[in-house]
Amino acid sequence: MSHKSAEMYELKKKVEELKKIRGRATELVSLYIPADYDLNKVMQQLREEYGTAQNIKSKTTRKNVLGALERAMQHLKLYRQTPETGLALFVGNVSEQEGVSDIRVFAIVPPEPLNVRLYRCDQTFVTEPLEEMLRVKDAYGLITVEKNEATIGILRGKKIEVIEDLTSNVPGKTRAGGQSARRYERIREQEAHEFMKRIGEHASSVFLPLLEKDELKGIIIGGPGPTKEEFVEGEYLHHELRKRILGVVDISYHGEYGLRELVEKASDILREHEAVKERKLVQQFFKHLVKDTGLITYGEKEVRKALELGAVDILLLSEGYDRVRVKALCNNCGWEELKTMTEAEFELYKKNLKACPKCNSQNISVEKWDVAEELIKIAEEGGAEVEIISLDTEEGQQFYKAFGGIAAILRYKLQ
């Protein structure tokens, strides 16, 4: 996975975290600063907002908004200039206990340049500009064609989406002879022609808007017989879409299974595409597992150990993996505990950890961090590749459910 892909994965995790936060009132500050924008102007705006916020009637809301603006201005002083791709700041009281203030700053330097300048104080953080960066824009058009049916779909990222199933009234062949047979054949050819036209029209309505947005990277057409070639050679597709045909492939199925087979059979065409690459990686992992080569490991503890030994060639992480690393420390006696758990388990852990089990002191600090981000950093420092496995494919689902969404392909066997 490229450095940018790793950044996108981490951005997705941060956006998910931000979207879960809710303010008790209009008190969460979102600030988007485009690349090269003058930070002095931003500071001036925040000072003006600070003055306005002093008029908020609710004492609690006023305190939280003023606190958020103060923290935002303090954080901006850390930057001599706006980062190369811009800066997104999210500041506010994240405490779920009424009357308790826990104002936190979430600073994100995005992997792509920000083109929006925004300040908003609301009950939720504004994440839409970052979510737009996460949207997979590159798309491939998929068409399966038979005499009596066709399916139009889109491959975007690793997800295959069925857009439309079409059926025709093309009659089957007849055994009648003479003029009846010729007349019947003409009717059959006309029906087939009309059906092909309809496929082309529906494909245009789906793919031309993608082409206009420069998102359509190509079209792949498949089918079990000669109909697919007739469709291509008959120029039923819009002329701009015909230029985007990457290949015509023989397949056995139709419908959703046909689209999956089309992507599989067109792997040479889509060699660099994520769906094909991901499928091959997971299959490689399963192959090592079945053959018991000793060149794989899975589970957070085992993968962490392999990473620390520098034995990992490829780190495989499911996008559904949501574990956090938690460290509890008694500031009185030094007792310490380190655990890995889910976000839901963390909330319960905090609630139940009322006193130190060693000295009974209540002076305990608890910190947490994202396991996936931590392991990605260790992997990159050790020269290992990192691959994020989506949940959009059967292989991705199987990897997540059967192996917990974390595994590694190793450079050498571990003792």
From Swiss-Prot:
Main location: cytoplasm
One MF term in the entry's GO annotations: translation release factor activity, codon specific
Organism: Thermococcus sibiricus (strain DSM 12597 / MM 739)
InterPro entries linked: eFR1_2_sf (IPR042226), eRF1_1_Pelota (IPR005140), eRF1_1_sf (IPR024049), eRF1_2 (IPR005141), eRF1_3 (IPR005142), Peptide_chain-rel_aRF1 (IPR020918), Peptide_chain-rel_eRF1/aRF1 (IPR004403), Ribosomal_eL30-like_sf (IPR029064)
Origin superkingdom: Archaea
Keyword set includes Transmembrane: no
Compartments, record wording: Cytoplasm
Protein name: Peptide chain release factor subunit 1
UniProt cross-references to Gene3D superfamilies, sorted A to Z: 3.30.1330.30, eRF1 domain 1 (3.30.960.10), eRF1 domain 2 (3.30.420.60)
Role description: Directs the termination of nascent peptide synthesis (translation) in response to the termination codons UAA, UAG and UGA.
Known partners and oligomeric status: Heterodimer of two subunits, one of which binds GTP.
Protein family: Belongs to the eukaryotic release factor 1 family.
